[in-house]
Amino acid sequence: IYADAGSNLIPSFLKKLNKEIKVVSMQLTIDDTVYRCYDDDIDVEQFSKNFYQMMREDRNIYTSQVNPDDFIQAFKEDVDAGHQIICFTLAKGISGTYNSACIARDMINEEHGKEIVYVVDAATAGFGEGLQAIHAADLVEKGWDFKAIVEEAETFKFKVRSEFTVGDIKYLIKKGRVSSLVAKFINLIKIKFLLKGSLDSKIEVSGKVFGRKI
């Protein structure tokens, strides 16, 4: 079982779970510094605290989608060992990572003349994706076969619902999800968007609330 770094399945967490899930790294750029998510030896908890502070400081922060060659190299050991692979990715509506994984899948399957790699569009992001990978890993441990796990994964993903709010909507504006005029009004009256993953693999507004209670 594989997932991309958008799954929030950090190495220490997977070690505690004792799950056989392999995470394909993703590139994170902060100003002029480039990190390989989960590959670089960093304190994830401390880095997360600094990361959100840097977001509030409006630093130049962005991620780069995993490219097809990254997936091919990540899969190589298991492909060479004759294993079949199920890979979960960020929702295709918010990242090109799914398409990259599909390109890698097609190249590997065509080369071997049979289905070795199957890619699941998680239709969500963050731990919603991670939860799906964990569920699939559980089924592997129970002895389910490849086809049965694939069928269950495609059903189970619609049982996972991810909802969240954002502290600042500037990133929604950058993505064109909110107009600058509406944004000014929202900031003025302190509205928070309630967001969710949609069934067509996009992020959509599900509601609006005033303030945030912690």
Label for each model-derived stretch:
Residues 1, 89-97, 177:
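An N-terminal domain-start capping segment
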Residues 54-55, 79, 140, 173:
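Hydrophobic residues in alpha-helical segments
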Residues 56-91, 99, 103, 150:
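Glycine-rich phosphate- or other oxyanion-binding loops that anchor nucleotides, phosphorylated ligands
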